[in-house]
Regions:
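Bacterial N-terminal signal peptides that target proteins for export
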Residues: 1-11
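Bacterial N-terminal signal peptides
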Residues: 9-19
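Boundary at the C-terminal end of the N-terminal hydrophobic targeting segment
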Residues: 21-25
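Active-site and ligand/interface coordination hotspots across diverse enzymes
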Residues: 26-94, 98
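Active-site histidine-anchored catalytic micro-motif
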Residues: 27-37, 43-45, 54, 63-65, ...
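Glycine-rich loop at the start of a catalytic domain that most often binds anionic cofactors/ligands
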Residues: 96-103, 135-138
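Short catalytic helix/loop segments, enriched in acidic residues and glycine
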Residues: 102-114
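Active-site machinery of serine-nucleophile hydrolases
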Residues: 111-130
């Protein structure tokens, strides 16, 4: 059973479909001048919306995906300056443990770290990571159910997610990974971002995985 907020969001999406279809049909009859004016008006509405007050009580969650954009904005303005990007994986974990083990672990540990810090939010867990070669399966890819990303794909995803968070005003982007194959990519991306950024900082935390 989903949360009440998710149920309402899903229903709203279904109700919007007829409106979207109607708007698409109307746009076909609009002149270039009218389209330009509509674009200016649309931009003005967006600018006003970006500074508008949140109309509902804030949800008590540290997961960005569970918050509205206004809730994230207000938390940033109130001093929440850290975002945690956690990486898990879908891989074989023996005959008794689910392939999503690392992702399930991170649901608890990322939240615990964020709550301990007190000024942090958790980005959506990166659930797909390098697990071995795909074309000629190696590593975990030799086991059914494993899903792998190429190393360059993984690093590109990390870089884009971190850059998105930095663009919104997060000053500290923290990388933690629950699997050994994730560590090199996070370290590489953190180094690249720190060379590029002037104010924000990327932090790769190897101790999260290598705690022994």
């Amino acid at each position: 059973m989903g949360s009440p907020r998710r149920i309402v969001t899903t229903l709203a999406a279904f109700l919007l479909v007829p409106t979207i279809v109607s708007a698409q049909a109307t746009r076909q009859d609009v002149t270039p001048e009218q389209r330009a004016r509509m674009q200016v008006e649309r931009e003005a509405r967006i600018v006003a919306e970006l500074v508008s007050r949140r109309p509902i009580e804030a949800l008590n969650s540290i997961w960005i995906e569970e918050l509205t954009w206004m809730e994230v904005r207000d938390l940033l303005q109130a001093g929440t300056n850290t975002a945690i990007i956690s990486t898990g994986g879908i891989e074989q974990n023996g005959p008794y443990v689910a392939t999503g083990k690392h992702n399930y672990v991170l649901e608890g540990t990322c939240e615990g770290v964020a709550l301990k810090l007190g000024n942090a939010l958790c980005a959506p867990i990166i659930k797909l990571v390098p697990e071995g070669d795909i074309d000629e399966p190696s590593g975990h890819m030799r086991y059914s159910g494993t899903i792998s990303l190429r190393q360059e794909t993984f690093e590109a995803v990390l870089e884009d997610v971190a850059s998105s968070l930095e663009a919104h005003g997060f000053e500290h982007i923290v990388f933690i990974g629950d699997s050994g194959g994730n560590q090199r990519g996070m370290e590489n991306v953190a180094r690249t971002l720190n060379e590029r950024w002037h104010k924000a900082h990327a932090h790769f935390i190897p101790e999260y995985y290598q705690y022994g």
